[in-house]
């Protein structure tokens, strides 16, 4: 990823960021965007230059104060050291693997989220719902991209299952290896636009990135025939320049996306249950054996499936547990 000649606007600079910079900061600092995050260093680009710098900001203690891919920073013109992270438009984050007290930042300042799933045995409505909850929570427009349509005789079956998750959800089936097929995603990849890419291991994200870029620079791995899955081949979070002038952010495959403080997103994705629950006899109804439960009545009447109900309760319970861990979090 090279961008030494880009202007700030091409990199995604918007009024939201420009208005945060004081006149003194404008004289003393360069605004730069984080294009990639590596261990112990970040790749940043600004107007006319690109370089690696240390990611450490003096005095920053909360994790949200440290830069992640997609962030805009101010760096000192003389020392090129980070001064501060500009206030984000949005931030994707999850529970850190192995430590429920901590959060892991995924990406910042995203315009559109491509939720990638494959048309094979690895397709999971539950996993799509998790990603949709995340998108709704941070207020980013989600597009479900179904890959490997060339490997199935019935891509419309997978598209119908994805579309049924939420009314009006945009679903785009593509053959990730075919530029003509992938071109249907161009509407979200224009100049200065940032698209994030999320999906589990082996769904074809790297192949999709290569086609969108017109390049084979991202390593891909063959899928395992026995179960339709594969290993992810992206090892760093990185932004890739697209032919249409936008930027695509690829992330390592994540099978277990742990939600945190996502009550709003859950309510939006499962708003059908939320609406019916207002008619339960008791305001604190747990939708179990309580008398007068409108949700259970709707399931019995065939308005909802038990499977979707179980997924709703599972995500809500997971979010409650993880949110409580955050509240109890103590500094190391």
List each language-model region with its residue ranges.
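Helix-rich effector regions associated with P-loop NTPase G domains
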Residues: 1-7, 25-28, 62-79, 85-112, ...
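Structural detector for short beta-strands of small beta-barrel domains
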Residues: 28-38
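Short aromatic-glycine-enriched beta-strand elements
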Residues: 40-44
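Beta-strand/loop nucleic-acid-binding surfaces
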Residues: 50-67
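Conserved beta-strand segments of the P-loop GTPase G domain that flank and frequently precede/overlap
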Residues: 115-118, 145-147
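Histidine-anchored nucleotide/phosphate-binding helix
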Residues: 126-137
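Canonical P-loop GTPase G-domain recognition
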Residues: 141, 148-203
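Walker A/P-loop
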Residues: 201, 206-207, 211
């Amino acid at each position: 990823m090279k961008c030494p000649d880009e202007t700030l606007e091409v990199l995604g600079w918007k009024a939201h960021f420009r208005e945060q910079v004081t006149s003194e900061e404008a004289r003393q600092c360069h605004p730069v965007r984080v294009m990639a995050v590596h261990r112990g260093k970040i790749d940043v680009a600004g107007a006319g230059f690109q370089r690696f710098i240390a990611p450490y900001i003096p005095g920053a203690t909360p994790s949200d104060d440290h830069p992640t891919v997609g962030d805009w920073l101010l760096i000192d013109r003389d020392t090129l050291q980070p001064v501060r992270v500009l206030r984000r438009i949005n931030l994707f984050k999850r529970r850190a693997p192995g430590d429920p007290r901590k959060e892991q930042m995924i990406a910042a300042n995203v315009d559109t989220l491509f939720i990638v799933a494959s048309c094979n045995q690895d397709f999971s409505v539950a996993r799509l719902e998790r990603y949709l909850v995340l998108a709704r929570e941070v207020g980013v427009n989600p597009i479900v991209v179904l890959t490997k349509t060339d490997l199935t005789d019935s891509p419309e079956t997978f598209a119908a299952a994805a579309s049924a998750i939420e009314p009006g959800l945009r679903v785009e089936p593509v053959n990730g290896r075919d530029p003509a097929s992938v071109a249907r995603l161009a509407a979200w990849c224009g100049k200065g636009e940032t698209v994030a890419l999320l999906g589990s291991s082996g769904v074809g994200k790297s192949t999709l990135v290569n086609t969108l870029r017109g390049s084979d620079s991202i390593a891909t791995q063959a899928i395992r025939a026995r179960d339709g899955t594969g290993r992810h081949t992206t090892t760093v979070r990185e932004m890739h320049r697209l032919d249409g002038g936008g930027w695509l952010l690829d992330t390592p495959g994540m099978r277990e996306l742990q939600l945190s403080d996502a009550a709003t997103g859950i309510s939006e994705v499962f708003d059908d249950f939320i609406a019916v629950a207002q008619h339960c006899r008791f305001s604190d109804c747990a939708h179990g054996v309580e008398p007068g439960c409108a949700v259970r009545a709707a399931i019995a009447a065939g308005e909802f499936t038990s499977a979707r109900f179980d997924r709703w309760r599972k995500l809500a319970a997971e979010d409650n547990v993880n949110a409580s861990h955050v509240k109890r979090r103590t500094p190391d």
